[in-house]
Amino acid sequence: MSAAPHISVLLDEVVEALDAKPGDVVVDGTFGAGGYTRAVLPTGASVVAFDRDPTVRQFAANLPADRFRLVQARFSEMLDELGPESVEGVMLDLGVSSMQLDQAERGFSFMRDGPLDMRMGDTGPTAADLVNTLDHAELAKILYVYGEEHASRRIASFILRRREERPFERTLDLAEVIERAVGGRKGAKVHPATRSFQGLRIAVNDELGELEAGLAAAERVLKPGGRLVVVTFHSLEDRIVKAFLAERAGKAPGGSRHAPPVAAGAAPSFQLISNKAIAPSEAELAVNPRARSSKLRAAVRTDAPVWEAAG
């Protein structure tokens, strides 16, 4: 398999925010090519990494067996694997990796022809399953809510009309239909299929549901004083992380529509490290333009009990 090397975003900032010490246990919830894990191991900490993608095991081959373990599972399953108050750090790097984008056979890219898959793991329905079976309303909702695509109804109409002739099987086939639906704007920096592909990818992998479950799991596995560090890549992810941390830090009056309601008067279970998200430097963007939309948010676990759902 050939792919451009994956560059971990905000790497120095993640390591600084984690502040891992020798003997600590840190969760890398999104192992990928192992960039964050490799940056944390020199601190003397141990890393338990999670990834639903079985192909990433190749990147774990040379890591120290006494301080590293890779679990093929979603990061939302970390509580089942590790138990409560068991780690000093949790880091999550959300979204699809450049490694996956660059592999045409994974079906994430509208620039490279491949099977219309988009699964981060090897189970569950594919993007082709969705575009070939969902009705107009369901498909338009995915494109609008998850892709933030304002032409969602028109795109859905074009997709349904075309699939009457033959089912969608390839990424470029779908991208071309979307481009016909919305038209390519001359000089546009963003490909017309960008938002639609994002929406389908999020739906295929239940990324937002996984994020909410993962944040709740991190709250439970962190010891008091442990640190949660999350890197997001689009506004849907960042809003969920921001709302979760603000609520758990007692800074969100009225609660969050992104998280389950919690009992009133709960003591803050997190303390924010910074009230503002950290963005990549100009120097990093010059080396890795894909980092441009990334944001880092971090918080420290207090000794307060885990917030429980109300009712």
From Swiss-Prot:
Positions bound to S-adenosyl-L-methionine: 34-36, 51, 75, 93, 100
Coiled coil location: none
Keywords: Cytoplasm, Methyltransferase, rRNA processing, S-adenosyl-L-methionine, Transferase
The enzyme's E.C. designation: 2.1.1.199
Assigned GO CC terms: cytoplasm
Chemical reaction(s) catalysed: cytidine(1402) in 16S rRNA + S-adenosyl-L-methionine = N(4)-methylcytidine(1402) in 16S rRNA + S-adenosyl-L-homocysteine + H(+)
GO terms of molecular function: rRNA (cytosine-N4-)-methyltransferase activity
Highest taxon above the source species: Bacteria
SUPFAM superfamilies: Putative methyltransferase TM0872, insert domain, S-adenosyl-L-methionine-dependent methyltransferases
InterPro entries reported for this sequence: RsmH, SAM-dep_MeTrfase_MraW_recog, SAM-dependent_MTases_sf
Role played: Specifically methylates the N4 position of cytidine in position 1402 (C1402) of 16S rRNA.
Entry-linked HAMAP family: 16SrRNA_methyltr_H
Protein name per UniProt: Ribosomal RNA small subunit methyltransferase H
Record organism: Caulobacter vibrioides (strain NA1000 / CB15N)
Gene (name only): rsmH
